[in-house]
């Protein structure tokens, strides 16, 4: 049985919807047709990066209680605090979407330090006169390893999926959770306490990271 409807096979039109670039779509078509091997695609697009995925707490609740505009202002404040930290710690890419922030780093230690410092500065901001009645807090997830340098975040693959799951769905306010591969890259640090987490519905191993002097 053939598919009875039109399929969009134009790489340039597909790319106009900003999923992947035109080159990536063309290479996916080549991969599908056998003109490109898996190894060739991997060699072209793989790179090793640390992914820091951060989510802001209370976005839905603040929108319901204070209105949408106030919730947007909370997001802006969080971005004003977090983005300078990410740049200071060497983030190669920072992207914001709604109440999420994704940053890429060359090494996992920089991502972890950036997460800790973001938490610290958010707390300082929330204690300042600049804060609102419903201040936001950050939840952070960190992954590290080989990902595909494709898509808007230039990091797609298993470690990106895990970091996003930790930062957006599992981590609580002021909490930093890291994947097993990220833990392997930073576990020798004496200034950080790592605690393996155990949850009933846990999909993969992960660790909670906290500074020892806090």
Spans of features found by a protein language model:
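Intrinsically disordered, glycine/charged-rich C-terminal tails and inter-domain linkers
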Residues: 1-40, 44, 173-214
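Alpha-helical scaffold within the catalytic cores of cyclic-nucleotide enzymes
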Residues: 13, 73-90, 102-140, 144, ...
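Catalytic-site or vestigial catalytic-site microsegments of nucleotide-handling domains
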Residues: 51-61
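A generic structural signal for short hydrophobic patches within well-formed alpha-helices
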Residues: 59, 111, 147, 182-183
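Conserved long alpha-helical elements within nucleotide-processing catalytic cores of c-di-GMP signaling
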Residues: 60-80, 94-95
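Short beta-strand
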Residues: 92-96, 131-133, 196-197
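Short aromatic/hydrophobic contact patches that present stacked aromatics
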Residues: 100-102, 208
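Catalytic-core segments of nucleotide cyclases and related cyclic-nucleotide turnover enzymes
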Residues: 148-171
């Amino acid at each position: 049985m053939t598919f009875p409807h039109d399929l969009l096979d134009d790489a340039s039109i597909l790319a106009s919807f900003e999923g992947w670039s035109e080159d990536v779509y063309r290479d996916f078509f080549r991969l599908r047709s056998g003109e490109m091997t898996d190894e060739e695609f991997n060699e072209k697009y793989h790179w090793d990066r640390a992914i820091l995925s951060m989510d802001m707490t209370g976005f839905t609740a603040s929108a319901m209680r204070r209105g949408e505009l106030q919730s947007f202002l909370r997001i802006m404040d969080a971005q004003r605090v977090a983005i300078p930290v990410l740049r200071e710690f060497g983030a190669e890419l920072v992207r914001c979407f709604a109440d999420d922030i994704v940053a890429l780093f060359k090494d996992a230690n920089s991502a972890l330090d950036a997460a800790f410092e973001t938490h610290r500065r958010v707390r300082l901001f929330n204690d300042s006169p600049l804060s609102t009645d419903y201040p936001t807090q950050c939840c952070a997830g960190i992954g590290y390893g080989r990902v595909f340098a494709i898509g808007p975040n230039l990091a797609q693959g298993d470690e990106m999926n895990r970091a996003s799951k930790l930062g957006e769905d599992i981590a609580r306010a002021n909490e930093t959770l890291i994947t097993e591969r990220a833990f392997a890259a930073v576990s020798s640090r004496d200034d950080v306490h790592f605690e393996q987490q155990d949850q009933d519905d846990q999909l993969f191993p992960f660790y909670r990271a906290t500074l020892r002097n806090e």
